Amino acid sequence: MAEEKRKRILSGIQPTGTPTLGNYIGAVRNWALLQSDYECLYMVADLHSLTVRQVPADLRRRTRELAALLLAVGIDPKEHVLFVQSHVPAHTELSWVLACNTQFGELSRMTQFKDKSAKHPDNVNGGLFT
């Protein structure tokens, strides 16, 4: 009988600030636990964090710190994939293809767009739509 493939999980966390207890309880702790049952791909979503203005040096530092934190809580890069979003060109290329095939009306109804627009009314940019 053929070996059954494990289901795959893709998830990411933005390096927008100091990780909180909420980040740990709500996501990161579960990521470590899910590794035994799933094929996991976890990303530090640095490109997603660009929808809010960032100081480049701070973003690079927080990206490294977040990757180190994920390793420290038990994400196993020998068994699963841990990557920085901006280091994978195919991610940006696919984003462009999807953006060119998604209607503006669909994007404007997204809850993340509405939430971020309300929180940062002085910085509503095109990146929020993707």
Predicted regions mapped to residue ranges:
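N-terminal Rossmann-like or analogous alpha/beta NTP/dinucleotide-binding catalytic cores
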Residues: A2-T130
